[in-house]
């Protein structure tokens, strides 16, 4: 039943991609008349985690100063925003696991953005998949919200933009991109990095840079591609990693039927890279990619938090295994 549901969703989002051009005024007018997933700043919540405080309490723009870190005059942590996608939440197991991996790795301040209302998560199970276009239309607004929080961090807590990184999955990747555009508009500078985990394809993949996540949205934009229907194979970033060629991830079953598994696998790959249980090595894309065993630091790039320390940019093929930690490099680290 679950696979049938996502097969129907696949058919739906393909229809939406061709019937509703993102940013089309006629679509905007229709969404204004009836929006089952309305955006409001009041419905966006934040979970704020540090090594010292891992409580999953929700905060808003009005209550954020009740958190201990925001009672200080300066925040010295590296900051990571994590943003979920369509019909998901900040409390989904995959995102909490990512946050935990970050805190195990370094002394981060992790802010999970929960925009479940505008992402249509609260709608009836049999109906909400039809509301994708409404959630897609809310991504820029959620991006503006993240930019507002960023402005607070920079201007009130002396956090350098170089200390702020955004991670977003699916629609959350485009939301992160819109945040990157907004902070530049506010003259705050650029984020250190934006990491797009299988950015949503429907409604976005044929759009110009201004209407989706783009390589100019941060100093470094890392894209991890894992599905070609719910996601996209279009190059979007400073580096684009095509895991198993960007679709049909090992262990996810048949094409299309396993599309949702492939789409969410991007989150799991990135989390494993944070844990450094292995280095998922990207080799430059070509008709005949070189073996991982012959990679050097100047030729290839490891997926993850350290990707931007490698000199090479562009598109990379990344071989993966079907089970965590997903390595296909026999322990090689470059």
UniProtKB/Swiss-Prot annotation:
Protein name: Phospholipase A1 2
Family: Belongs to the AB hydrolase superfamily. Lipase family.
PTM statement from Swiss-Prot or TrEMBL: Not glycosylated.
Cellular compartments annotated: Secreted
Paired cysteines (S-S): 37-120, 209-214, 252-261, 278-302, 279-327, 295-300
Propeptide: 24-33
Top-level division of the source organism's lineage: Eukaryota
């Amino acid at each position: 039943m679950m696979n049938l549901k996502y097969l129907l969703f696949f058919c739906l989002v393909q229809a939406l991609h061709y019937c509703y051009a993102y940013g089309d005024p006629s679509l905007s007018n229709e969404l204004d008349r009836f929006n089952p997933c309305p955006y409001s700043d009041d419905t966006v919540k934040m979970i704020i985690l540090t090594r010292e405080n891992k409580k999953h309490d929700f905060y808003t723009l009005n209550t954020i100063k009740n958190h201990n870190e925001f009672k200080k005059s300066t925040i010295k942590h590296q900051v990571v925003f994590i943003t979920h996608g369509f019909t998901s939440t900040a409390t989904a197991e995959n995102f909490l696991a990512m946050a935990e991996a970050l805190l195990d790795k370094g002394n981060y301040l992790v802010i999970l953005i929960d925009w479940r209302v505008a992402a249509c998560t609260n709608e009836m199970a049999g109906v909400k998949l039809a509301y994708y276009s409404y959630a897609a239309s809310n991504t820029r607004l959620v991006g503006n919200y993240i930019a507002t929080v960023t402005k607070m961090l920079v201007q009130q807590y002396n956090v350098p933009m170089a200390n702020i990184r955004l991670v977003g999955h699916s629609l959350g990747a485009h939301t992160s991109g819109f945040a990157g555009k907004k902070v530049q508009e506010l003259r705050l500078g650029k984020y250190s990095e934006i990491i797009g985990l299988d950015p949503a394809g429907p409604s976005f993949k044929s759009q110009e840079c201004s209407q989706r996540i783009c390589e100019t949205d941060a100093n470094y934009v890392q894209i991890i591609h894992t599905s070609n229907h719910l996601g996209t194979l279009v190059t979007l970033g400073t580096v684009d990693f095509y895991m198993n060629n960007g679709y049909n991830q090992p262990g996810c079953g048949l094409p299309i039927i396993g599309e949702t598994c492939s789409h969410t696998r991007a989150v799991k790959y990135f989390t494993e890279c944070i844990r450094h249980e292995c280095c998922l090595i990207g080799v430059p894309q070509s008709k005949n990619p070189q073996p991982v065993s012959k990679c050097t630091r100047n030729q290839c790039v490891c997926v993850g938090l350290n990707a931007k320390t490698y000199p090479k940019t562009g598109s990379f093929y990344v071989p993966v295994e079907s089970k965590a930690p997903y390595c296909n490099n026999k322990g090689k680290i470059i």
